């Protein structure tokens, strides 16, 4: 049985205390755009042209990967590698060559992730990359959450309504993200339960 354990190495911080290295940003949610999937495909091709040897899989994650869902217009990309140590040697500089900044300071809180972001000429964040070991808890949890919302549009709408409400309540991204944690954890648990049921049924045949 595949189990996904709750671990602190996740995009959304589990701690209720705001890390000192996080910068406040105002929340902007854009209506869903088909351009987001096309933008991911473009970045995916660029990444594969440089790190195909080490990237075992590249996935579009986060709210921009869920059709119909309003989101912060930032393309979330997750790269799965066999080994972070190999990725440190071979992938980091290649990703930087595509215009991404490697934000190493976040590894104090998230040592099992390498984080990169790309910004527009105006300094607005447009893309972010989470480089993790494939099939790690971080990898599985991101995909469980994304796939569950893709399969359940009504739940995705609940999530959108929550995000819109929280965006009016909180003035920076950390508080906004932290306030979504309970909803996300509940969805992860439901998705894991569905996965376990399918695995139990498959073992009967």
Language model feature labels by segment:
Residues 60, 127-130, 142:
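Histidine-centered active-site/metal-ligand motif
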Residues 30-47, 81-116:
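Metal-dependent nucleotidyltransferase catalytic core
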Residues 4-59, 192:
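Helical scaffold of the NTase/Pol beta-like nucleotidyltransferase catalytic core
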Residues 106-110, 114-129, 185-186, 190, ...:
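Expand to "…catalyze enediolate/carbanion chemistry for C-C bond making/breaking, isomerization
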Residues 46-75, 79-85, 89:
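Active-site nucleotide-donor binding segment shared across nucleotidyl transfer reactions
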Residues 135-205:
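Catalytic cores of NTP-dependent nucleotidyl/adenyl transfer enzymes across multiple folds
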């Amino acid at each position: 049985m595949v189990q996904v354990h709750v671990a602190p190495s996740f995009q959304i911080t589990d701690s209720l205390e705001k890390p000192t290295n996080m910068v406040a940003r105002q929340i902007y949610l854009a209506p869903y755009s088909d351009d987001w999937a096309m933008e991911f495909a473009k970045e995916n091709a660029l990444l594969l042209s440089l790190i195909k040897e080490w990237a075992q899989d590249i996935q579009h994650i986060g709210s921009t990967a869920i059709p119909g869902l309003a989101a912060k217009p930032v393309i979330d990309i997750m790269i799965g590698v066999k080994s972070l140590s190999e990725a440190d040697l071979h992938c980091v500089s290649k990703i930087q060559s595509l215009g991404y900044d490697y934000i190493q300071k976040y590894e104090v809180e998230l040592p099992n992730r390498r984080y990169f972001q790309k910004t527009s000429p105006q300094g607005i964040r447009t893309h972010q990359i989470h480089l993790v070991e494939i099939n790690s808890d971080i990898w599985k949890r991101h995909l469980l959450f994304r796939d569950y919302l893709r399969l359940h549009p009504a739940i995705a709408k609940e999530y959108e309504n929550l995000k819109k409400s929280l965006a009016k309540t909180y003035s920076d991204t950390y508080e906004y993200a932290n306030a979504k944690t309970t909803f996300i954890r509940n969805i992860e648990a439901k998705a894991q339960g569905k996965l376990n049921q399918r695995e139990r049924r498959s073992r009967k045949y």
